[in-house]
Amino acid sequence: MKTSRLPIAIQQAVMRRLWEKLAQANLKLGRNYPEPKLSYTQRGTSAGTAWLESYEIRLNPVLLLENSEAFIEEVVPHELAHLLVWKHFGRVAPHGKEWKWMMESVLGVPARRTHQFELQSVRRNTFPYRCKCQEHQLTVRRHNRVVRGEAVYRCVHCGEQLTAK
């Protein structure tokens, strides 16, 4: 499913969640942070990104369509938290203690750094790599970094260096 045409009902649900969490944050923080710009232009395997300087949230329309409920519940507050942390604290670690606090204490959402959505429809070419416990699929970018000797990747489970299959 490569379409970026989103049903209006899904766009409205995204906006409701954004407004709800922004109002909640403004109330708890005693601030009046503005509504960020929202676009559906994120591509690839990222569910969303927060652009600090332009105060914008970019969401992946394909992943949103395929995972609407979980996406709206998790990704929208996740990206909003990045913008609120930037407004409230300035430049800090992207998923540091300030972001975790904003997610859990202010927005009331579990602080997860990554999504668990199925990526088959948005994944492009991948390259098989192995460790001692499983097979991994590296993106073209990561594969090229390995080939050029710029990066080494390790399995998060066993810690072994990944090798091309």
Curated annotation (Swiss-Prot):
Zn(2+) binds at H78, H82. GO terms for cellular component: cytoplasm. SMART domains: SprT (SM00731). Binds 1 zinc ion. It comes from the Bacteria. Its main location: cytoplasm. Its cofactor is Zn(2+). GO terms for biological process: response to stress. It is found in: Cytoplasm. Keywords: Cytoplasm, Metal-binding, Zinc. The active site is at E79. One of its GO terms (molecular function) is zinc ion binding. Residues 22-163 form the SprT-like domain. HAMAP family: SprT (MF_00746). PANTHER family: PROTEIN SPRT. NCBIfam families: PRK04860.1 (NF003421). Belongs to the SprT family. This is Protein SprT. The lineage of its organism: Bacteria, Pseudomonadati, Pseudomonadota, Gammaproteobacteria, Enterobacterales. The gene is sprT.
